[in-house]
Amino acid sequence: MEVTDLDKTEENRELVKNFLYDVMQGNNLDKTPDYFDGDNYIQHNSGIADGVSGLNAALGALAEQGISMVYDEVHMVLAQGNFVLAVSEGTFGGAPTSYYDLWRVENGKIAEHWDVMETIADQSTWQNQNGKF
């Protein structure tokens, strides 16, 4: 897989930023279709099925179980061509969490996603004062 669409870097960065603000931070699942090409969406998180329907089902299942996934702050959004990486902070199930999300954009829509989530340790256990972000 290669980086393409270098001329669309800023456009793709804005698409992902808007998705984060509208859907992940704003919790507006009704806006999800604005960011995808129908149900076409490749998901690399093994706990979520492919397709926008898989994403919505996973988010809905978490909510039904009383598990919240909150994106409080987007610290940085790095982009090159059709790839956009967002580094965010929030909570998962009430625990402070860092989110690293990588998206591939195709034809102005989010097409593919990889992610890593990590619980942020209590500051009293840190071996330095650099912080997670």
Each language-model region and where it sits:
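C-terminal and inter-domain tail/linker signature
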Residues: M1-F133
